[in-house]
Amino acid sequence: MSLRNKVTLIGYTGKEVEMVNFDNGNVKASVSLATSDYYTNAKGEKVEETQWHNLVAFGKVAEIFQKYVPKGKEIAIEGKLTYRSYDDKDGVKKYITEIKVDEILLLGGK
């Protein structure tokens, strides 16, 4: 049996792409992505529920983000779910969930 970690999302970027350049020449792009779902509540009203996802990309994919993905751009991505942690300035362990993007498709919009 093959186990797979694969995420596919379509949504709108919520901020400008943040770039980090590493000493070894590699680059990292970070951006948030909003996806929305709708449901009907007990009063019969349609309610929109938005989820925010943290995306990271490296290398050529990061360069595509930098050049072609402004705030508010509709994109489709494929990648894998990743988890990491760090200790903040007060020594408290913080946990981060991110999607490491392997493929990006630029869609309509801005």
For the regions a language model picked out, list residue spans one by one:
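Single-stranded nucleic acid-binding surfaces, predominantly the OB-fold ssDNA-binding core
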Residues: M1-K110
